[in-house]
Amino acid sequence: MLCALLLLPSLLGATRASPTSGPQECAKGSTVWCQDLQTAARCGAVGYCQGAVWNKPTAKSLPCDVCQDIAAAAGNGLNPDATESDILALVMKTCEWLPSQESSAGCKWMVDAHSSAILSMLRGAPDSAPAQVCTALSLCEPLQRHLATLRPLSKEDTFEAVAPFMANGPLTFHPRQAPEGALCQDCVRQVSRLQEAVRSNLTLADLNIQEQCESLGPGLAVLCKNYLFQFFVPADQALRLLPPQELCRKGGFCEELGAPARLTQVVAMDGVPSLELGLPRKQSEMQMKAGVTCEVCMNVVQKLDHWLMSNSSELMITHALERVCSVMPASITKECIILVDTYSPSLVQLVAKITPEKVCKFIRLCGNRRRARAVHDAYAIVPSPEWDAENQGSFCNGCKRLLTVSSHNLESKSTKRDILVAFKGGCSILPLPYMIQCKHFVTQYEPVLIESLKDMMDPVAVCKKVGACHGPRTPLLGTDQCALGPSFWCRSQEAAKLCNAVQHCQKHVWKEMHLHAGEHA
């Protein structure tokens, strides 16, 4: 009895809204009445469809999203000067988003023929009016109808839907021997678990149905199961075809061997942090070749240490690093430039805190027995003459080095995976057939996209754009160590030469120092 009472209002509502007369097709019920505004008007069921079908959740698609946005803007009264003709023209414009000319023309005809019904719907509740209008014009499809009409994907669609990890195109990577890293291991473990379940005749959709859908109740559980079946079939097929390592490698969760060394922070002796370069270590000591040696490092750092006895602020160290190579002997000037260019971030942190010998040990140019080490070729980049001549700023070189490393990191498989995910996110607003084609396009053209990003990350251009590098400029008073005056100029012969103050120091400082020394003697 209770069930009958609950059913009675819906039956009465359907009877009241049902057409009393009309074509024979109207006798087929609401499935036919509510397919669009034209049919509903012909069957006299506009009111019923508006309240029972068109106000329900809709399937996501580009025409539907555009239509609902425009309908919401047209119906919210934000433009009080908009006439009814203006509103109808906006709604008619959305019909152009339909995929075929025939459906677009039919949509425009309905807007023109049933303008009063459309305006009436737009004046309704703001939260339901856009969906009602757009579903009535066939720009949106009710979600329940969309899921009910889905069919399993064909073999051709399945191949495209499983991209990128099933695509045999640009993302076919060389297999690695063993998974490494926490992310890779987690991926392999998860895929192995799913494959074991698949082997026991449980599909991936079944696993999710058991965990997710059963708790939703009988009404939503059917929609949930239908949805999962359609979208997990491609992944289920991939699980049956590929081993775990292959799936995770193709998905970008496992890196290839021989990834480029990266900068790592390590805890140094005496508790001083060292930005040590992640250079490849060998069991035997590197044979010394042309480049930066332990002796060059010691010479440069000792000179810096001597200059900075009274002022060892980070700014002063940075300025000293820019000038130190100009006072080095000509035989090691080139090596000095390489040293400063490669290790300046570490030197700035370390010079003020520890002895020169420890500095050179920290950056691995001096071993325990002070045997010579060579800087790895990948980092031994001599600054171009233009850079030295322009004096572009202390942060310029670091900025360019940072962007160069970032550009190289674009080759990382995990980075490529993240970029692909970002690009494919834009495909999600398209209807399913277009979404598959969009994702396939992104996968096919991934090398071109990555290369374009690398071109946009030109280190010199970007660093100039953000102001890290500037054109030639004369050092201002207070930004140069020579601006400290005689207390710095006359500290040593090298400092006097550096500041062009040899005569001044000889006449006013060193001469007086010799006189005082003679008096005390």
UniProtKB/Swiss-Prot annotation:
Glycosylation (residues): N201, N311
Question: Which residues are propeptide?
Answer: 18-59, 146-180, 259-288, 370-391, 474-521
**Segments forming domain Saposin B-type:** 60-144, 180-258, 290-370, 392-473
Listed as disulfide-bonded, the cysteine pairs are C64-C140, C67-C134, C95-C107, C184-C254, C187-C248, C213-C224, C294-C366, C297-C360, C325-C336, C396-C469, C399-C463, C427-C438
Q: Which GO terms describe its cellular component?
A: cytosol; extracellular space; lysosome; membrane
Please give the Gene3D superfamilies that the UniProt record associates with this protein: Saposin-like
InterPro entries the record matches: SAP_A (IPR003119), SapB_1 (IPR007856), SapB_2 (IPR008138), Saposin (IPR008373), Saposin-like (IPR011001), Saposin_chordata (IPR021165), SaposinB_dom (IPR008139), Sphingo_Act-Surfact_Prot (IPR051428)
SUPFAM superfamilies this protein is in? Saposin
Sorted UniProt keywords: Disulfide bond, Glycoprotein, Lipid metabolism, Repeat, Secreted, Signal, Sphingolipid metabolism
Q: What is its main location?
A: secreted
Annotated localization: Secreted
Biological process annotations from GO: adenylate cyclase-inhibiting G protein-coupled receptor signaling pathway; epithelial cell differentiation involved in prostate gland development; prostate gland growth; regulation of lipid metabolic process; sphingolipid metabolic process
Signal sequence region: 1-17
Q: Where is the Saposin A-type domain?
A: 19-59, 475-515
What is this protein's function per UniProt? May activate the lysosomal degradation of sphingolipids.
Q: What is this protein called?
A: Proactivator polypeptide-like 1
What organism does the record attribute this protein to? Homo sapiens (Human)
